[in-house]
Each structure stands twice: as structure tokens, then as C-alpha cells.
């Protein structure tokens, strides 16, 4: 069956929900898809369709990132519902890297919680430039003054992580009440239900406040591989988000990383949201069909790139901020020879920290939680690295630092 073409009529934005577990991220995502499907002939997504990652059912915790799409009058959105649970921050680091903006969901009944702060910090680290706040569960808050206090606390928290907390739009509402109303009557237009209207009000703010990003379309093509599938009779498909540049069916690409020498292949097809494309540009979440490549020759953590534009490296110098104990970082110092995981794009690679330098250029033998430091890192596997690239340092399931590559050494 021929797939229909993906039409590019509106600017495309990648967005996601972040916030503490059980504050209502997935419920809000479902309510947005249902509200924006009204009158379009499309259908929204139910809560259980978004929450459908296989491991979750036992614990009711979102683990995998769910991708949904919807449109406002001015834009097309791809929305990731980020995992809320601390153990799955690993997924958020790969998922949040996909966001041009975020909707921070905070329960108006509880206020900011530890994971709220962790997600704001992560958003800062992975470079999510803008966010809008949804104060959820307004129906459970009897005293309007209480909601105002929660809003103030959220704004202060955002300020403390260098987001413009005073100007970020905050919309209060109840995702559950809106979702229930839309489930009973899927044709509720604007103005017919106060709870549903709050969802529209939220999306109006997202449209207005989160700018359409300047895509890096003119730079050389690069896409970090998130997943690899084998399609019988057609070959191997690598999926991911195009980070920069564009790729056209028929072009050659290098597959770089986790090996010393890049592989070269030809792109034989492109698909987005199950529709075929002739070309794919920065910002697209896309599947790339690769000629003559076996499924076991590519894996998550490699990148597809324009030939000879990026090389695999194992050693680099970086500027790193080591999280303080209060931010969920380590409680004890670490020393040269420390071996944590380095998260780069979609990969986690073990690396050894060879040496540290203080801001004044002097060698230092010990790094305390809360320090900012220059460090030289040697990875155990080569991956596609370039100057200015961000990464996270993780250990035992938690983020202990965030950094940016300042020099490539080998």
C-alpha cells in the first residue's frame, strides 16, 4: 500500500511534557490531542494509547517516550510524553534532547516536587530553550490563594535554574476534567466547557511563547540513531531526529560511531509519521532506509551524517558542572581515574576521567559536588563527537554532572 505524503504546510515544533511523577503529564498529553482533534476529522489519543509502553503496566509508571502529533491553527507539533520517574531519567535525557520547548506540569495541589526540579535542571542541561507551565489538578484546590502560592513557588524555582520565571506563562486547569469532558463528547468546541477551554488557553500560550526555532538546515546533515528496525524485503531502517542539515533520497551518508572507521551507504527511502518523504530536514523525527546495511551493523548511539563531516573520537576536553548534593548529585568527591557513564545524544558510553583543571588553569586532584571544572575524558568506545556538543555524566541511574565539549584530543 502506498503511503500518503507528509504535507509541510505549517512550521513544525518538537515539544514535550515534563514534571513530577503522577502530576498529570500523560493525562494532559491525551487532553491536548483530544481538544486539538475537535473539528479536524482526526481522532485524539486516549490516555492508555499514550501510556502504552509494555513495562509500565505493572507499576503504572511511564518508561518509554511516547510520540504523538497534533496541530494548532498556526503550527504542527510532535509531542513527546517524557518519563516522569527518576529511574527513567535516562530516557528523559534522550527524549528531552528532542524538545524545542516543554510544558512543565505541576500539580496545583502539591506544588514543585523533587522530580519537578530535576526535570527543570535537566531541561537546562540538555538545552530546552523555553517552557510554559500548566498548573494541573485545579479542581482539587479549594482556595485560589493556595494556587497563587504554588504559582509563585514554581516561578521562583524556574528563576533559580536560570529560566525567566517571571515571564514564563502559567495556565491553571485540570487535565483530567478536560479529558473526561472530551471523552463524553469529542466535539466540544471552544467556549463550551471551561475545563477544555483551559487546554486551548495553554496551547495558545505555547503557540505564542515558544518561538519557532531556527532550524540548522544549512549545516551538514546529522541524525543521531535512536532505534533500528529491519523491514522484510526493504532493508534496514534507522530512526531518529534530524539534528541539522537535510537529507534527500539517493544521497550517500556515513554511519559514524562505536567503530573506528565509519561505514558509507546510500539512503533509499525516508518516512515520517508513516508517510513517505523525498527529503528530510532538521527537526524531523524520521525513519531512514539504508542500502545494503544489516540490522546488526547499526545501533542506537551511532549517527548518520554527510560523508566526512564528523569523525569518531575517544578523547576530549570538556567544561563540566558537577551537581551539588542538594541537586541530586554525588555526596562525595571524585578523583582522576573515576569511570562514570557519558550520555552523548542517544548513547551512554563508559569513560575514564584522566585529569582535572581548575578555572585558573591549575591541575587539581579532587572534584567536589558543586564544582565547575575542566576535565579530560577518554571513552572506551569511539563515538561521533564535536566541539560545542553537550553531554550528561551519570552514575548508578542519576545525573552527577553536565558538560560541553571544549576540545577534541583524539
Swiss-Prot record:
Residues 174-176 are annotated as: G5. Residues 81-84 are annotated as: G3. Residues 60-64 are annotated as: G2. Residues 19-26 are annotated as: G1. Its EC number is 3.6.5.3. Keywords: Chloroplast, Elongation factor, GTP-binding, Hydrolase, Magnesium, Metal-binding, Nucleotide-binding, Plastid, Protein biosynthesis. One of its GO terms (molecular function) is translation elongation factor activity. InterPro entries: EF-Tu_GTP-bd, EF-Tu_GTPase, EFTu-like_2, EFTU_2, G_TR_CS, P-loop_NTPase, Small_GTP-bd, T_Tr_GTP-bd_dom. GO terms for cellular component: chloroplast; mitochondrion. GO terms for biological process: mitochondrial translational elongation. CDD domains: EF_Tu, EFTU_II, EFTU_III. It holds the Pfam family GTP_EFTU_D2. Mg(2+) binds at residue 26. It comes from the Eukaryota. Residues 136-139 are annotated as: G4. NCBIfam families: EF-Tu (TIGR00485), PRK00049.1 (NF000766), PRK12735.1 (NF009372), PRK12736.1 (NF009373), small_GTP (TIGR00231). PANTHER family: ELONGATION FACTOR TU, CHLOROPLASTIC, ELONGATION FACTOR TU-RELATED. Belongs to the TRAFAC class translation factor GTPase superfamily. Classic translation factor GTPase family. EF-Tu/EF-1A subfamily. This is Elongation factor Tu, chloroplastic. It comes from Mesostigma viride (Green alga).
Amino acid at each position: 500500500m502506498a503511503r500518503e505524503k507528509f504535507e509541510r504546510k505549517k512550521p513544525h515544533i518538537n515539544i514535550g511534557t515534563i514534571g513530577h511523577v503522577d502530576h498529570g503529564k500523560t493525562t494532559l498529553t491525551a487532553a491536548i490531542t483530544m481538544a486539538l482533534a475537535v473539528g479536524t476529522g482526526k481522532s485524539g489519543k486516549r490516555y492508555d494509547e499514550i501510556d502504552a509502553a509494555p513495562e509500565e503496566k505493572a507499576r503504572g509508571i511511564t518508561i518509554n517516550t511516547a510520540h504523538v502529533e497534533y496541530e494548532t491553527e498556526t503550527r504542527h507539533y510532535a509531542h513527546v510524553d517524557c518519563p516522569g520517574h527518576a529511574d527513567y531519567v535516562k530516557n528523559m535525557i534522550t527524549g528531552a534532547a528532542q524538545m524545542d520547548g516543554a510544558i512543565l506540569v505541576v500539580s496545583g495541589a502539591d506544588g514543585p516536587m523533587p522530580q519537578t526540579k530535576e526535570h527543570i535542571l535537566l531541561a537546562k542541561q540538555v538545552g530546552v530553550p523555553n517552557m510554559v507551565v500548566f498548573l494541573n489538578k485545579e479542581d482539587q484546590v479549594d482556595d485560589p490563594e493556595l494556587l497563587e502560592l504554588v504559582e509563585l513557588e514554581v516561578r521562583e524555582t524556574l528563576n533559580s535554574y536560570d529560566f525567566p520565571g517571571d515571564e514564563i506563562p502559567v495556565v491553571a486547569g485540570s487535565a483530567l476534567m478536560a479529558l473526561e469532558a472530551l471523552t463524553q463528547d469529542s466535539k466540544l468546541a471552544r467556549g463550551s466547557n471551561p475545563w477544555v477551554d483551559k487546554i486551548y488557553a495553554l496551547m495558545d500560550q505555547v503557540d505564542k511563547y515558544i518561538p519557532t526555532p531556527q532550524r540548522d538546515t544549512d549545516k551538514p546533515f546529522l541524525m543521531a540513531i535512536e532505534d533500528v528496525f529491519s523491514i522484510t524485503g526493504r532493508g534496514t531502517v534507522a530512526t531518529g531526529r534530524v539534528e541539522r542539515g537535510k537529507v534527500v533520497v539517493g544521497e550517500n551518508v556515513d554511519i559514524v560511531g562505536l567503530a573506528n572507521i565509519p561505514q558509507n551507504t546510500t539512503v533509499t527511502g525516508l518516512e515520517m509519521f508513516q508517510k513517505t518523504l523525498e527529503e528530510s530536514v532538521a527537526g524531523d523525527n524520521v525513519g531512514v532506509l539504508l542500502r545494503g546495511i544489516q540490522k546488526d551493523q547499526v545501533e542506537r548511539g551511532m549517527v548518520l551524517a554527510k560523508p566526512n563531516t564528523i569523525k569518531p573520537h575517544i578523547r576530549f576536553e570538556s567544561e563540566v558542572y558537577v551537581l551539588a548534593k542538594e541537586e541530586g548529585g554525588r555526596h562525595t568527591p571524585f578523583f582522576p581515574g573515576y569511570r562514570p557513564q557519558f550520555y552523548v545524544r542517544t548513547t551512554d558510553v563508559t569513560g575514564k576521567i584522566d585529569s582535572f583543571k581548575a578555572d585558573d588553569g591549575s591541575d587539581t586532584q579532587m572534584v567536589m559536588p558543586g564544582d565547575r571544572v575542566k576535565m579530560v575524558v577518554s571513552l572506551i568506545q569511539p563515538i561521533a563527537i564535536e566541539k560545542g556538543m553537550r553531554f550528561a555524566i551519570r552514575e548508578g541511574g542519576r545525573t552527577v554532572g553536565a558538560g560541553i565539549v571544549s576540545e577534541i584530543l583524539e
